[in-house]
Swiss-Prot record:
Residues holding GTP: 17-23, 34-35, 37, 40, 66, 125-126, 128, 156-157
Substrates-to-products reaction catalysed: GTP + H2O = GDP + phosphate + H(+)
Binding of Mg(2+), residues: 22, 40, 63
Protein name: Ras-related protein Rab-7a
Cofactor: Mg(2+)
SUPFAM superfamilies: P-loop containing nucleoside triphosphate hydrolases
Gene giving rise to this polypeptide: RAB7A
Family: Belongs to the small GTPase superfamily. Rab family.
Stored PROSITE patterns: RAB (PS51419)
Lineage: Eukaryota, Metazoa, Chordata, Craniata, Vertebrata
Amino acid sequence: MTSRKKVLLKVIILGDSGVGKTSLMNQYVNKKFSNQYKATIGADFLTKEVMVDDRLVTMQIWDTAGQERFQSLGVAFYRGADCCVLVFDVTAPNTFKTLDSWRDEFLIQASPRDPENFPFVVLGNKIDLENRQVATKRAQAWCYSKNNIPYFETSAKEAINVEQAFQTIVRNALKQETEVELYNEFPEPIKLDKNDRTKPSAEGCSC
């Protein structure tokens, strides 16, 4: 038996500008936080190697600009994603309201094989701030209505729930990657109607 190959997982972080996507990524990968805000231009990514159930996994985490002019980054950017992280700011209701459009944008551009079960994770960021505007129950209700998406309330600044959230992200992404590999290795069998079983094929293979 050949040794198990190294797994590369592509994770995309989406959300409005200023919700803390870059800060969350930097806190998880580099254990750093900066109070200086610098808008992401286009897209950028960081990598991190983690062990999951004795498997070495390399996470390629893509951070995107939230401005509308960058919203359509192209099919190549979205394709091949194993998990999509949707981020909003709990102190800014408008960033929560746009989660639907970000989710739809991803599904349209990425065209996953099984969109109904594609793994999303939602992060309500900046819980360290006092002027909270989006209630936990409201966010949980939205996630439940979207096939029960896992939801975490985070603070990139205080490193609250960041590690826990990304553990769920990598496990869900790994599950998606495994299912895709199995799908590619074992294509769906041809289903014959019971009336077709006794009929010889006159057309031959339709491949």
